[in-house]
């Protein structure tokens, strides 16, 4: 079957029919990727442009699937930006919050894995999509703005550290998490509570996306109430592998309001659950990979130099409320502390 005929055929499927044939469609696309890999660049570009054109006539959820194929196979930023704009513009009735969140993680992960996919607008689009999703989840939970626990009521010796994934110590982000917790508890004398929100590459509500990637999750950690690291013992909680779960988010907010930590440290960013909790106590986000776009908290610590929109060469974060650019060099901030 020729490519054009194949696209025309699947474009006639409704969503149920598409998912029933999803494995076959993915197999056909994988075979097409192998064929495209043997062609000259000009031929490959022509075929991808044909697919892009035909995708324009498809339902938006199907268009996202086909554009994700074009993005990964072309290895060019143009398709990344078109895909992100398609997700941003998609009506909630066609692509809901959970599906858009899954798309956010899939695209961000692809860009992190292959820097060639990142264009001039990619980071801006990821940030806009994250903010859109954060606002949607806040709306679902009835959260209308920051409502901090009064500073005089907060426990100055208690810090909540949240992250979207906890694996073994050979996993670099987990090691970063434990290193930060060690500094806070052993050297700064804080009581640290670690919460794995399990929001990393959420598969809940995932829609069609080419070569979908999944995050690691260790269910056995749900049975632990503490973690030991270099002689320190940390209180530990892990969310079930069904995030984002609105009931679980409410429970975490209630825990924040009841235990009243002095602040919340979000390791990794791009964690809507952590950012929602950050509406009730000050939140500091420590980025790890592509997560610089994904933070809503009051402050952020970036681990690499970032281009400042004001022209400053230092690292920067932007206050989403005031639009003020707060610039500083944060290369060694956490290590020195």
Regions found by a protein language model. Name each.
Residues 1-62, 67-70, 90-222:
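N-terminal subdomain of nucleotide-sugar transferases
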Residues 72, 162-166, 196-199, 240-241, ...:
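Structural motif
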Residues 117-125, 280-336:
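Active-site-proximal region of nucleotide-activated glycan assembly enzymes
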Residues 201-209, 273, 293, 308-313:
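Short, charged/polar "capping" segments at the starts of alpha-helices
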Residues 208-245:
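Conserved nucleotide-sugar phosphate-binding/catalytic loop shared by glycosyltransferases and other
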Residues 242-256:
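Alpha/beta-hydrolase active-site loop
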Residues 251-252, 272-279, 297:
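A short acidic, amphipathic alpha-helical/loop segment
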Residues 254-271:
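Short N-terminal targeting/anchoring amphipathic segment
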């Amino acid at each position: 079957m020729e490519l054009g005929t194949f696209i025309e055929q699947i474009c006639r499927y409704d969503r149920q029919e598409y998912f029933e044939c999803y494995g076959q469609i993915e197999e056909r696309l994988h075979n097409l990727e192998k064929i495209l890999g043997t062609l000259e660049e000009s031929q490959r570009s022509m075929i991808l442009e044909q697919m892009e054109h035909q995708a324009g006539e498809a339902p938006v959820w199907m268009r996202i699937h086909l554009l994700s194929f074009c993005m990964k196979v072309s290895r060019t930023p143009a398709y990344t930006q078109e895909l992100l704009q398609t997700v941003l513009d998609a009506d909630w009735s066609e692509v809901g919050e959970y599906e858009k969140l899954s798309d956010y993680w899939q695209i961000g992960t692809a860009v992190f894995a292959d820097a060639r996919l990142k264009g001039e607008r990619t980071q801006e689009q990821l940030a806009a999509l994250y903010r859109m999703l954060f606002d949607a989840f806040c709306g679902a939970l009835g959260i209308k703005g920051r409502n901090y626990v009064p500073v005089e009521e907060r426990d100055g010796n208690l810090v909540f550290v949240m992250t979207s994934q906890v694996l073994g110590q050979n996993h670099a982000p987990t090691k970063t998490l434990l290193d930060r917790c060690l500094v806070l508890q052993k050297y700064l004398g804080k009581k640290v509570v670690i919460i794995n929100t399990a929001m990393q590459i959420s598969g809940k509500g995932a829609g069609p996306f080419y070569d979908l990637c999944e995050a690691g999750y260790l269910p056995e950690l749900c049975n632990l109430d503490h973690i030991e690291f270099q002689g320190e013992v940390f209180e530990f909680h892990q969310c079930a592998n069904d995030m984002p779960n609105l009931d679980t988010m409410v429970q975490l907010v209630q825990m924040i309001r009841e235990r009243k930590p002095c602040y919340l440290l979000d390791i990794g960013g791009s964690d809507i659950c952590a950012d929602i909790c950050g509406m009730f106590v000050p939140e500091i986000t420590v980025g790890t990979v592509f997560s610089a776009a994904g933070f809503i908290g009051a402050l952020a610590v970036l681990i690499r130099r970032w281009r400042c929109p004001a022209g400053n060469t230092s690292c920067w974060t932007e206050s989403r409320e005031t639009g003020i650019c707060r610039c500083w060099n944060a290369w060694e901030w956490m290590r020195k502390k």
